[in-house]
Amino acid sequence: MKLTDGVLRSFRVAKVFRENSDKINCFDFSPTGETVISSSDDDSIVLYDCQEGKPKRTLYSKKYGVDLIRYTHAANTVVYSSNKIDDTIRYLSLHDNKYIRYFPGHSKRVVALSMSPVDDTFISASLDKTIRLWDLRSPNCQGLMHLQGKPVCSFDPEGLIFAAGVNSEMVKLYDLRSFDKGPFATFKMQYDRTCEWTSLKFSQDGKLILMSTNGGFLRLVDAFKGAVMHTFGGYNNSKAVTLEASFTPDSQFIMIGSEDGKIHVWNCESGMKVAVLDGKHTGPITCLQFNPKFMTFASACSNMAFWLPTIDD
């Protein structure tokens, strides 16, 4: 089944899970698409089975809190940031609920975490205005970049380069093997006083970069030239909430939730809005991602919703 405007318009909520007492701040699909794991402001980690459509387990990180949860490549392991006490990143085995390693270094809250798609490298960005490069096998930071403002960061799909968004006005591209030489490309964007960048994502084909903001718009940027291709708006975000925007796995569409529980979908090429879907969420949709392997996506406020298409194309 191929994703088309019609298929996207046909998506409906198939299941809603009420496992959390506070907002879900992040979730991540496993590379196989078989499970999704969420972190929440209620300090819980919930693992869901996507095929059976049910929660499998709940773990807690009461002391440190949990945010920015990411699967690693090893089965049943995740990394996540703390959102209270300290700013150490933790590497957890879900199998026995034990920490494998800690990654200390950041002196302020971690605001972005990106796992390399190909190996054990990951990068983190913090309000301490640094990006750190790590290897899961060592607690020591493998690389450090001091930046001129609040950063966001992400690996490209090949794991060869990473992008840093700095101070909501600049995108810098680094080669992983020679990042200490500085960025090989810098794209200056129009600065917007009304909001700040909250995340940066590459499309799966590596050609596009999506800049999310805590305002009422998103920017789609050509990953090679740095030109803004489209600015997407027309969704509600009056309270400056961090809303997650995502590409579909075929790199053809972009989706974002809104504060009124609706999901807006645009075509990347034409820039046209193709669908507005009502998730009937009780609060702002803080997290939204398409499954990397199956024709389903998930959205979350304090509830988690699984969506399925209702037509067979």
UniProtKB/Swiss-Prot annotation:
It comes from the Eukaryota. InterPro entries: G-protein_beta_WD-40_rep, Swd2/WDR82, WD40/YVTN_repeat-like_dom_sf, WD40_repeat_dom_sf, WD40_rpt. Keywords: Chromosome, Cytoplasm, Nucleus, Repeat, Transcription, Transcription regulation, Transcription termination, WD repeat. WD repeats lie at residues 19-58, 105-144, 146-184, 192-231, 236-276, 280-313. One of its GO terms (cellular component) is PTW/PP1 phosphatase complex. Pfam families: WD40. PANTHER family: WD REPEAT-CONTAINING PROTEIN 82, WD40 REPEAT PROTEIN SWD2. Regulatory component of the SET1/COMPASS complex implicated in the tethering of this complex to transcriptional start sites of active genes. Facilitates histone H3 'Lys-4' methylation (H3K4me) via recruitment of the SETD1A or SETD1B to the 'Ser-5' phosphorylated C-terminal domain (CTD) of RNA polymerase II large subunit (POLR2A). Component of the PNUTS-PP1 protein phosphatase complex, a protein phosphatase 1 (PP1) complex that promotes RNA polymerase II transcription pause-release, allowing transcription elongation. This is WD repeat-containing protein 82-A. The gene is wdr82-a.
